[in-house]
Amino acid sequence: TSCIYQFSLDEMNRGTIKLKPGKADSHLIADFKTAYTNRGDWAGADGITMDSKGNLYTGNFGNGVMSKITFNDDGTVKSNKVFVQDKGLTCCDGIFYDAAKNVIYVSDSEKNAIRVVSMDGKVTTLSENADTNGADGSMDQPCEVLVRGNEMVISNFDMPFPGLKNTKFDAPYTLSVIKMK
């Protein structure tokens, strides 16, 4: 089980926060389960972002399902629903909301790809490449993505888990850049 917890700034400034085990902790706002994956491992929630309306999104590394969490005015959870479940998105690692384009970019570590998710949950591919060492700037298991000006900066993890396109460790070419329009 993967979880998302919510803490006030006041609580954090007071020092160490001790959590209660399992679902007993009042800070717990969402939990997610993943079945054993087709890659032969267990994986869970990975990546978190918020849109311009204050909705929170997370993806599941193990199966690519994205969830959308909405909030009441007092900050409590209003809903936690599946936002995307698409055969074209089988792995969510880092995710980034681009306010200028009103889309979410997803690092698909399994397929060496960056996916684009529209606010109505449609998935398209921005970039995908074969298993490379990254020396030419191509992706080598992207794990985080962000947009800076007219560039998308991608951090590469380069960890050869079974079932991923990335099959071996390479020299540390850790960043890739895609020029945006």
Where are these regions (language model features)?
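Short loop/turn segments immediately following beta-strands, especially the blade-tip
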Residues: 7-20, 69-76, 118-123, 179-181
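Surface loops at the rim/top face of extracytoplasmic beta-rich domains
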Residues: 1-27, 31, 57-63, 67
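Conserved beta-strand positions in repeat-built beta-propeller and related beta-rich domains
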Residues: 1, 50, 56-62, 98, ...
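Structural signal for beta-propeller blades
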Residues: 2-5, 64-67, 112-114, 161-162, ...
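Oxyanion-binding "anion nests"
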Residues: 46-73, 77
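Beta-propeller blade signature
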Residues: 4-8, 168-181
